[in-house]
Amino acid sequence: MEGKWLLCMLLVLGTAIVEAHDGHDDDVIDIEDDLDDVIEEVEDSKPDTTAPPSSPKVTYKAPVPTGEVYFADSFDRGTLSGWILSKAKKDDTDDEIAKYDGKWEVEEMKESKLPGDKGLVLMSRAKHHAISAKLNKPFLFDTKPLIVQYEVNFQNGIECGGAYVKLLSKTPELNLDQFHDKTPYTIMFGPDKCGEDYKLHFIFRHKNPKTGIYEEKHAKRPDADLKTYFTDKKTHLYTLILNPDNSFEILVDQSVVNSGNLLNDMTPPVNPSREIEDPEDRKPEDWDERPKIPDPEAVKPDDWDEDAPAKIPDEEATKPEGWLDDEPEYVPDPDAEKPEDWDEDMDGEWEAPQIANPRCESAPGCGVWQRPVIDNPNYKGKWKPPMIDNPSYQGIWKPRKIPNPDFFEDLEPFRMTPFSAIGLELWSMTSDIFFDNFIICADRRIVDDWANDGWGLKKAADGAAEPGVVGQMIEAAEERPWLWVVYILTVALPVFLVILFCCSGKKQTSGMEYKKTDAPQPDVKEEEEEKEEEKDKGDEEEEGEEKLEEKQKSDAEEDGGTVSQEEEDRKPKAEEDEILNRSPRNRKPRRE
């Protein structure tokens, strides 16, 4: 309303200026001043389109567990309190890199959109890193599910390295300040990447109930494309859920990317086969594995020439006219000069380099002409007997099966070795890997609340700071230049079709333009036919009138030159009827 009122004022003042143009100069100046004031008021009332729209502010508050947890840390205290740096050395490694001397810090992300939100940061590159913390109490695999969740942000991307966690097995020998790569763990979970191989590990160590030996069991690879989680430099939430019924789920950003069952979807399988191949069994010497054999009764045909060449000279070819038989194809370069440092005793007699014979350029060829070769129609090659089914074929030999002496059946692989600590034991060629909001719990609701209060705020802050749709399209095109072609076609094609549609319409003929009347309109052809009929009818009427007038004249002359009043009245009426008949309003209606 305010904008409309200001526009009305501008119109009124503009009218006043025009009316006062012939008036006093002082009045004109006053009106112009008023107009300038109104224009300034309109400009001031316009919104500032240059300033970017303010993003909704997201206030950070450290998450607090809403129930019982085995472990939780948001690092918002700003210290490594509760975490222990390893002092161990890695075995079978050069002393220069054997130490776990990688640096860890607690700090905010480099481009944090949540002031006050801190995390654990792997600071150095090309070093071994190891840090761990005790759980509030050991986790026992009984009737409750296990849920492990934490956040990772590859702030500088990732070349080669991991961001996985290890749940360290509860053993009497567990010493966190000596945590290293061979420290026993129960579960390893999290992202890992080297080259173009993007992984999301879920590995658990299963104890053989017969031998007591532990063996790693790897979950199947996720079907989802994991590359974006490593390259987009955003914070991602990784969740592992293990249930007492042996089912598992792996989630990224609260969406399932992998799921399965510990009994069916691990490699190698938890339970070995009931039977195995007998390692002592040997294939018999007379075992025939050949499905086809040469026909022993086949005989080489008498006319089979094994010595015939595959190619023969073309006898029908003729030497092209102008062929220079006496000219060599290459000649010494006449412009070449012997190098000054050429030593004939050491280098031998100097010879000019060969160049293409210039006389051959205008000829079909030079040198001795030879007939071209063609395929020999009589060539058959080495004769071989045809193959037939082997009547003695016994199939592919396999050793016999015997009962597996190491067979066992564990129907509850969920009941793994209890663990009492969480650790990060990593090697990375990229620094500034950000970890945050670790939680280990048995209640999904508590974990979801923790995620909403931590990762959920990060996601909201990132969404508030993200560019609009156009900005996101431009960013995507910068990463994938071929998208520019898609954008151009998407915009240009509809415009082209609209222009083509608007410019290619057929022009209507004048015969199809209707008159502004409610009366039925004739088609062009019918209208022309009616005009011809009316013209012929008019000519006949004129001819009849002329004859009538001549007859009346002659009658009048016979009657003494007098004309009756009745005849005088009939004449104007006939003329009026003729005019009415020629009027378009009295035409016949168009025939359907």
UniProtKB/Swiss-Prot annotation:
Among PROSITE patterns, the record links this protein to: CALRETICULIN_1, CALRETICULIN_2, CALRETICULIN_REPEAT
On whether Transmembrane is a keyword of this UniProt record, the answer is: yes
Q: Which UniProt keywords apply?
A: Acetylation, Calcium, Chaperone, Disulfide bond, Endoplasmic reticulum, Host-virus interaction, Lectin, Lipoprotein, Membrane, Metal-binding, Mitochondrion, Palmitate, Phosphoprotein, Repeat, Signal, Transmembrane, Transmembrane helix, Ubl conjugation
Provide the positions where the record notes the PTM Phosphoserine: S554, S564, S583
Q: Which residues form the signal peptide?
A: 1-20
Topologically, how does it sit relative to the membrane? Answer: Single-pass type I membrane protein
**Entry keyword annotation includes Acyltransferase:** no
Q: What is the name attached to this protein's record?
A: Calnexin
